[in-house]
Amino acid sequence: MIIHLKNSQPADLPFMKEILYEAVFWRVDDKRPSFEEGSAYPGVIKSLADWGEREGDAAVIATINDVPVGAAWYRYWTKDNYIRGYMDENVPVLVIGVHQDHRHQGIGSKIIEWLIEHAKKSGIQKMSLMVSKDNYALSLYRQQGFQEYSDDEDSFTMLRDI
């Protein structure tokens, strides 16, 4: 299996929305809303609103045999406009997701490594993310150098120096 990584293009936005749904509703159970319902949640809408129009927006798409299977992006937020994982205006928040059929195959690691390298080249010094405490991706984030910064009852805000 060969995983290809590429900078996102405007045409990738529908796939990024799919991946955002996969990331937010990662638990595959009977409580998972439909894609249409989940995509309408205010926090989900906010995450990709006006994507690519803000300075610093950066994303990567992972493909296998030209089929998109995962994506990640980071974005800067403000104290008046932010998503979970926000720390301050100088620390972009990372969002990552891999289609459930392609998890546990190293795709998440490759995506994070690519984005960290991109962040280094862009002069970014830190990156944050939010993860539920029971999300199996927590171990991936720790392996990739993210550390718990704050304990938010059911989730952690994590921070990584770049």
Predicted regions and their residues:
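Conserved GNAT acetyl-CoA-binding A-motif
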Residues: 112, 119-132
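Conserved N-terminal entry element of GNAT/NAT acetyltransferase domains
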Residues: 1-14, 18, 22, 26
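Conserved acyl-donor/pantetheine-binding loop and adjacent beta-alpha core of acyl/acetyltransferases
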Residues: 63-96
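A short helix-loop-beta-strand connector motif used in the catalytic cores of GNAT acetyltransferases and
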Residues: 45-61
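Conserved acetyl-CoA-binding loop-helix of GNAT-fold acetyltransferases
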Residues: 95-98, 104-117, 142-143
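Conserved GNAT-fold acetyl-CoA-binding loop/helix
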Residues: 25-48
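Conserved beta-strand-loop-alpha-helix junction that forms the acyl-donor binding cleft
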Residues: 128-138, 155-159
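Conserved acetyl-CoA-binding loop of GNAT-fold acetyltransferases
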Residues: 142-152
